[in-house]
Each structure stands twice: as C-alpha cells, then as structure tokens.
Amino acid sequence: MKISRDAYANMYGPTVGDRIRLGDTELWIEIEKDHTHYGEEVVFGGGKVIRDGMGQSQLCSDSVMDTVITNVIIIDWWGIVKADVGLKDGRIVAIGKAGNPDTQPDVDIIIGAGTEIIAGENQILTAGAVDTHVHYICPQQVDEALMSGLTTMIGGGTGPATGSVATTNTPGPWHIGKMMQAVDDLPINIGFLGKGSASTPAALEEQVKAGVMSLKVHEDWAATPATIGNALDVADRYDIQVALHADSLNESGFVKDTLEAFKDRCIHSYHTEGAGGGHAPDIIVACGQPNVLPSSTNPTRPYTINTVDEHLDMLMECHHLDPNIPEDVAFADSRIRRETIAAEDILHDLGAISMISSDSQAMGRIGEVVCRTWQTAHKMRLQRGLLPEDQERGTDNFRVKRYIAKYTINPAITHGVSHEVGSVEIGKMADLVLWRPKFFGVKPSIILKGGMIAGAAMGDPNAAISTPQPVHYRRMFGALGRAVSATRVTFVSQAAMDTGLEEKLGLRSRLVACKNVRSMRKKDMKLNDYCPNITVDPETYEVRVDGVLLTCEPLSELPLAQLYHLF
C-alpha cells in the first residue's frame, strides 16, 4: 500500500526527508531518521491503533511505560529524528518504536493498560531549557520560566534585596538554607550560586557546604584577580563551577589580568559580550580561551534597532546607579557598545559563544531565553545564509542543533548537571517540552516536569472541551501538591550532600550533587566549541576574528514576536 506524503504527515506526522518550518522564522529542519515503522505506527483515538489486543499489550506496569509520546519529532544537539519516546518513573527510558510486541515487530517501548499516551504527531519535542543566570528576585519567575519551556534554573538571590537585584548571589549559610526551603515546592529544578567575592577561602567553603552548587564572582562585590583566584581554588577543591561577572571599570586590572588569574582553569564567563558587565570594551576576547565557557544573556539577543536604547535605563536601574552622577552615567555608557553586540550575533553563529541565559529581572527576561535564541538563529540565517555544515542538505539542521545546545546541554555540562538534565537522552529526568511547529520557540503546548505534565496551554476550564478560548498557560497537576517535590530536584555540591543537608533542612525534594565540573573545557561544549583569536579595537570597539571584521546590521523586525502576542 502506498500513501502520499501529505496524507501520511496528517495522520502520523512528517517522516524522513520531510521539512518543517520553525515558527515564523526562516529556519527549516529535515527529519534525519524515523524510528517508527511504516504501517505499524501507534496512534491513540477512536478506531485507532492503541487498543487492547492491537497496539496495547496485556503486560503489567512493571513491563510497560508510564507514558509514551507517539510519533514525535525530537530536536536535540545530537539529532533531528522522529520516534516514540517512553517515560517511566519520571525518566526517559526509551527512544524508538512503541507498541505491542505480541502483535507488532521490533517493539522496544511497550504500551499496556498502565500507560498514558501523549500524541506527538506533528509536534516537536525538546529538552527543558536550563537557565544558568537567574536572579532570584521573585518566586513568580518560576511560572514565567516554566511556561516558556524552562525546567531548570541556576542562579542566586534572596528576593528583591538590593544585592540580589544586581548580583546573582545567595550569600551565607542562613540565606542558603532558607532559600532551599523556599524552593522545595516550586515545580522547577533549582541550583544556587554563593557569593564568591572573597580573598580567603573560609567564607566560600561554608557556603559550598551549606548547599550552593557554584560560586559567583561579581564586580559589584569585587572581581579582582585575588577574588577570582580564591574562588577557583575553592571550586577546584569541591568540584563546582565559578561564574564570573568581570570588572567593567578595569579597576583592579584589565582583561589580560583576569585571564591570567584563571591560570588555565575552567570558568563560566557570564554575558561575555560585555553589555551585562565585564572588562570594557574587550571582555569578549574571553570567547577565544580554551578554558573559558562563555555565555550570553538575552537582552542583547539578537542585535536590533532597539537594543542599545533599551540597555541604558536597564543598566542604571539594575546596578543602583544615579543618573545625576556623571561617573555613573559614564560607567553605563562604557558597557553598551553596538560593535560588540553585533559581533556577538556572529560569534554565536560560529559556535564561539556556547550558551544563552536570561539575567532575569536584572537586565534580562526569564521567559524569553528560548525565543531570543531562535530569533538570533533566524537573524543569522537571513544575514549569513546556510552554514557550511548545512550546504549539502539545504536546510538548517546543523544550525538548529547548534542553537538548541546553547540553552540545554551546554549549560547543563557547564554546571555539572548533564547527568540529570539538558537533553532528550535515555536515563535523564523527563523534563520535556512539546511544541506545535508553528508555535516553536515561543509558545509550548505541554511542559513535562519529571515525567508529569506541570504546565500547558489550556482553554476555558468551564468549557465542554479543553480547547476553547481563552487559552492561558496554567499550572497542571504536576505542579501541585506532593507531586512537585517528587518530580523536581535541587542541585548542590557533593560536600553539601555529605553533611546530611536534606534531613537537616527538612526538605522533601531530592538533592542531586553536581559533578565532573572542573575537568570541563571549551572543547566539551556541544557544537559550540570554536576558540578563535579575537581582538577589539580600544578606540572604535570593532571586533575582529583572525583579523576579519565581525559586524552585521540590526534587524527592525523579528519573528516569534508581535505575530504571537497581543502586547
């Protein structure tokens, strides 16, 4: 029997060779592999396949999946494929062909009476996003994050305190303990950054043992070579990461001095373009270092006609600056440079900047990590055409895989949590996001947290069916009651785990230790490991890679924007 591609896609979703447009961007993907079998696809519904004795087996719960996502398109750093995905005990346990082995061939994901089905036909599945630059200013950020497709937040803060508004630190054992208790019932994975700005180790070590998973060195608290070196010494002892907001004013040294303070050790460089902070005007050269894991924050993503104007007021507010003090205004002006922001776009497209994060409520928007990433990819597709790796296929598969790695696997690797989150891979937590292609990157359909639906675009709860307007993002059952603590984790150091912190603080959520952090290098950043020789002209701020000028024009119109939002 033969069937047209259109008819097949309508029933079972696209297959190998079919192309899909992502939202209203100029990005197109092509299915690389199909794990399902033609003629044996499992579909739920009246008169469909997943019924007793057909696609549903007689096996009990110990042998079948808790949930199967059928015929879904997976986009991840490792590939763009179509498959059935099996979830059990809150984890991804299989990617392949679902069904009933008694009636169908080559089934490796068994459906039974104990299995729930999520129809993935004509939908895209991605890993939940990992945001590694979150200012914990208000708990309501969690809903904004979750409903945009984020499932892990790593950052610091204690609420709208002046220090937290400016810097991503949760300082000291008392605050760390209280914040760990506060997030215990929030439906998202959380990790805390301690205050790393100290020139002796004791005050940092007590924070590591109290529960932080990384240290943050910030210029507002001091980012001197001494504080950087001390934080890295402590990190080396406890196998944790150091995140750096470097010295914008060049008070204690220049970018060369900061790079020397690293002593070739692994470090996460925040907003490495510099508008968010860091040596003016040339912190961006850190992207070329093999030990530096560089990230961007989303307010400069991508470069548009409004980017520069928006930043000045944001900067004054976030860093407690006074517009009546000339030195404060000069400080703000020194950080906002069209030339480095334009170069940042291209460095992302080259794979020289490895991650994108938010800088939530402190110059960035937590609900826009995902959409700003794809807007950047779209801009580069328009301005730079197909990447060399995509020329043969003629679609944007490699570029899409490069960009999705920036907010999933690479931040997870950087902070030592990729054994739990960051990709659609067997054994990891089932923190997954479903998207309809026309809403990809901007409005997810369903957000799963630890295998349970925690958020969704849901219609009127009083309607006869679930789809009528008004459709809002709402918390689902996975975000309520004891299910929350059973499907989320708090990331800590192994040293904190060894103190019995869980029992001491009375936590219900599982604690998970970060690991394999200090051995990471730029070469470990998936599809984003380019280490170019970068120079910045101190007078004109022009950025060059291997002598070639990096520049591009700002866009006046973006996808994934007004078309999808009333406001």
Swiss-Prot record:
Protein's GO biological process: urea catabolic process
A cellular component annotation (GO) from this entry: cytoplasm
Binding site for substrate: 218
Modifications made to the protein after synthesis: Carboxylation allows a single lysine to coordinate two nickel ions.
Co-factor remark: Binds 2 nickel ions per subunit.
GO molecular function term, any single one: urease activity
PROSITE patterns the UniProt entry points to: UREASE_1, UREASE_3
Reaction equation(s) it catalyzes: urea + 2 H2O + H(+) = hydrogencarbonate + 2 NH4(+)
Residue ranges constituting the Urease domain according to the UniProt record: 128-567
One Pfam family in the UniProt entry: Amidohydro_1
Active site (catalytic residues): 319
CDD domains: Urease_alpha
Keywords, in A-Z order: Cytoplasm, Hydrolase, Metal-binding, Nickel
Sequence positions bearing N6-carboxylysine: 216
Family listed: Belongs to the metallo-dependent hydrolases superfamily. Urease alpha subunit family.
Protein name, per record: Urease subunit alpha 1
UniProt source species: Psychrobacter cryohalolentis (strain ATCC BAA-1226 / DSM 17306 / VKM B-2378 / K5)
Gene (name only): ureC1
